[in-house]
Amino acid sequence: MKKLFAILLCVCMILSVVACAPATNNNGTTEPEKTEAEYKLGMGVVVSSASSKTGLAQIDATVAAVVTDKDGKIVAARIDVAQNKFDLTADFATEVAKTFETKMELGSRYGMEGKVDNDGNGVMKEWDAQAKAFETYVVGKTSAEVNSIELQEAGGHQIAVDKVLLDAGCSMQITDFIAAVVKACNDEQGMTFKTAETFTLGVAAKSTAAESTAATAEADGTIKLYSDFAANVVAGDKIIAAVNDAIQPNIAVNTLGEIVSAEFKGTKRELKEGYNMAAFGQSMDWNGDGKVLEWYLQSAEFSKFVVGKTAAEVEAMATKEVEGAGYIISADDALLTAGCTIQITAIKAVVAQAAKNAR
C-alpha cells in the first residue's frame, strides 16, 4: 500500500511540474509568459482650411491614433488625412454627392511618389509610405519628445532634421503629424485598457459634403465638409479599445466661387458642452428617459458598447428610425439606456472601418 501511495505521489509531482512548465513553441524553445499591461488609446485631429481659394473649398483633417504605455511612451501610432476638396466651378449636385477617400485609402493613387525630394537624398516615396515611416519613428517617444522633433525648412515645407526619419523616406511636411500625435497622446477622453495579448491599431475617416448648400443671389452658400473619425485597438479580431470623434467645419462661399469665410470651432469631443446637444433637451430625448447627454458623452458610450465586437458585428448593429425625425439610432436597449441616442449610421461605418484598418 505504501509503495502504491509513493508511486501515485511521484506521478502527481511530475504532472505538477509539467503543468507549471513554460510553454514551448514548435522549435522547442521556451516562450516567455505574456504579462498583462495597462495602455491608453488616444486620438487627435488637426483641421485646416488654409488651402481653400476662389473656386475651391478644401478641408485638410489630419487624424492620429496612438497607444501609450503606463510611462506615456508610444507603443503604436497610426496617421491618416481626410483631404476633402469641393470644386466650386463644377456641377454643385455632383460635388455634393461625391465620395471622399483618405490619403491612406488612395495609396499609390495619391501620386506623390517620385515627385517630391525635399531633402535631396533621391528617395521620393508615396504619401502612405512616408506616413508609415513617421508612425514607426514616434514609437518609444513621449508626447513631449514628439512635440520637440526638430524641423527645417525645405522647398517651403517644414520637414524633419533627423536623418533617421529622412533616410526612412519621410521627407514631407510633418507639422500636422506632430500636432495630431501630441493631441492623441494627451487625449483626456481616451480609453484605458489592459491586455496581455498582441494587438493592432487602426484609424479611419469617413467624409461627406451632403449637407452643403449652394450660393444664390440672395445668400451665400455653405460648403459642409463633415468627417467622422474612429480609432480601434484590436486583439484577435475583436475591438478591445475604441474612440470616435467628428468635425463640422463650414466654408461660406458666394456665387462667384469666392471664399467668404471659414469656421471651425473644434472637434465634437473637444467642444464638450460647447457643442450644445444637451440644450435641445426633450426634443432629442429619443429613449424617453427625460435627459439628453452631450455629444461627447454619447460618443464615449458608443465606444464602450463596441468593445468585444468584431468589425462585422459593429456593421450589423441593429438600428431604427425615429418616427417623424428621420434620425437613425440604435435599436439596442442597452446602448439607448446608457444614453447614446445620437444618429449612429456614420459612427458605425467609421468604427467598423477602423477595425478593418488595424495593422
Predicted segments, located by residue:
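Positively charged n-region of N-terminal signal peptides that target proteins for export
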Residues: 1-8
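N-terminal cationic leader/targeting segments used for protein routing and processing
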Residues: 3, 26-28, 266
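Iron-sulfur (Fe-S) cluster-binding modules
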Residues: 4, 15, 73
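Hydrophobic core
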Residues: 9, 13-17
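Bacterial lipoprotein signal-peptidase II cleavage site
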Residues: 18-30
